[in-house]
Amino acid sequence: MNGHDQRMLIRADRVIGRGDASPHMNAVLIKGGLIEDILSEDSVPAHTKIYDFPGHVIAPFFCDYHLHFSSSAGLSTAGIADRLLAHGINKAFEGGDAIGAGLTAKKNLADRLEILSSGFGIYREGGYGKYIGRGVKDIEQAKSEIEALISAGADYVKVVHSGIYDPEDDRITAGGFERRELGEIIAYVRDRGLPVFCHANGTEAVQEAVDLGASAIIHGLQVSEETLSLIADKRVMFIPTLQAFQSLRSRAASDVSLRNLEEAVEGHMAAVGRAHAMGVKVMPGSDAGPPFIPYGSSFCDELWLLMKAGIPFEDVLRNASARAIKRDQQADLLILEGFEIRHVVRRGEFLQ
């Protein structure tokens, strides 16, 4: 739509994002692929090409706080990047697999995406985790795997501290560490300078992870009010992956499974709404990677579900932002109607 060196202004109803933007700002001035200024409607410079989008908002690119680079998705890493960028995602926290594919993707896609990789999760042998990590039988083996992750360039360590939801029996499957083991693992990782993100379902597993120093809880199904209060007090991130749970309905094996899933999702959404009201930082993560959770579109569905759970539109967008909208930074912007992406601006250029 525009020449790269021409000064251009993108104007909408408002600019939503962390950084220099204030509530009365509704336009972003771009030159040479960089944000020159964030403006109000009455302060447009002369000789500027203007693109108007009434009824829309301008937002930063998104960060997906939980996904996997999975071979089962049927896409190359470049294809995954294409899908993510088309949905306005240029930053992602990669949640691990058995072979550490995210570490390779981080290197190969460094010029396109900012990927923070866990490499592979750490899980207790005999419990859930073989598809997303490597099993350990004791603390010493866990420390050895953690050292391997650090050497390979992992940005954080993912610890699997529960199983997954089984809708047929309405229970959380076996998985996780003993409390003492989990405490030692988290302390070891933190001493090495990395955060710990815990896969945890069931309020006891979530509470242990938060008590012992986890930086983030992934999933958190069946979390109690008391544990939500603890999450708020300790300023732990909560990544509820609502869309991932909801997507399981298409795979329900029976009417009983479907009913249990619907009730579980309803309860999880209620917990997310309470978490936000308590001041918990609820972050959007798609859990994309499996074929039934597509890259990009499932993240956008997650945003809608977070708002449906009771988080205001602007708070959802701010939490989803990969970075602030600031002067002199690269002009990566989204033109949104609700959460629907109408245009993507990458390095000051409208993508076709």
Q: What does each of the following model-derived ranges do?
A:
Residues 1-44, 349-350:
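N-terminal metal-binding scaffold of metallo-dependent hydrolase/deaminase domains
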Residues 13, 28, 33, 55, ...:
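Divalent metal-coordination and catalytic microenvironments
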Residues 78-194, 237-245, 251:
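Divalent-metal coordination cores built from histidine and acidic residues
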Residues 85, 109, 190, 232, ...:
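Anion (oxyanion) recognition and catalysis
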Residues 168-270, 283, 288-290, 308-311, ...:
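Active-site core of metal-dependent hydrolases
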Residues 191, 265-339:
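His/Asp/Glu-enriched, well-ordered alpha-helical/loop segment
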